[in-house]
Amino acid sequence: MTTPSKSPAENFRPANKRGAARLAAVQALYQMDVAGTGLLETTAEYEAFRLGKEIDGDLYREADAQWFRAILSGVIENQTFIDPVIRQSLTEDWPLSRLDSTLRAILRAGVYELSKRSDVPVPVVVSEYIDIAKAFYGEEEEPKLVNAVLDRVARRMRGEGKGKDPS
C-alpha cells in the first residue's frame, strides 16, 4: 500500500458541499484514530477552524456541516457494526488492522452511508469515496480496493452494485 498524500485538498475538488463534508469526515476520522481525539473535540475543531477555511495555503471548500456531523457521529456510534462489515468484504487473509488509518477512515465513512443512509444512491456513495481515495493515493491500488469493498457492501446491504452477488 502506498503512503497517502499529505494534502488531499490539492487533489480533490468536491463538486458540492456534501462531497466536501465527506472529505472532511474522512480527515476527522483519521485524526481521531491517530491522535486519539474525541468526537466532540474533533467536530468542534473542524467546524471552527477547517470547514470552508484556508489552512497552510490550501482553501478547503465550504462543507455541509450537518452532513459532516452525521457521518462522523454515525461512524463512531456504529463502528462495532461497521468494522465487521468491512472485514467480511476484505479477502480472508487481509485483516482490517492491516489497512492504514486513512483507508480505514474512507471505508468506515462509506460503509456508514451505505448501511445507514438509504436516501443516498449507491453510485453516489461509491463514486465519492473512490474520489476521496484517489485524492489521498492517486491512481494506486487503494481506490480499487475502496471500489471493491463498497461494491460488495452495497450488494449485501442494498442489493445494488456493479458486480453480481456471489451468494
UniProtKB/Swiss-Prot annotation:
The gene is nusB. SUPFAM superfamilies: NusB-like. HAMAP family: NusB (MF_00073). It holds the Pfam family NusB. One of its GO terms (biological process) is DNA-templated transcription termination. Keywords: RNA-binding, Transcription, Transcription antitermination, Transcription regulation. Involved in transcription antitermination. Required for transcription of ribosomal RNA (rRNA) genes. Binds specifically to the boxA antiterminator sequence of the ribosomal RNA (rrn) operons. This is Transcription antitermination protein NusB. The lineage of its organism: Bacteria, Pseudomonadati, Pseudomonadota, Alphaproteobacteria, Hyphomicrobiales. Belongs to the NusB family. GO terms for cellular component: cytosol. InterPro entries: NusB-like_sf, NusB_fam, NusB_RsmB_TIM44. GO terms for molecular function: RNA binding. Gene3D superfamilies: NusB-like. PANTHER family: ANTITERMINATION NUSB DOMAIN-CONTAINING PROTEIN, N UTILIZATION SUBSTANCE PROTEIN B-RELATED.
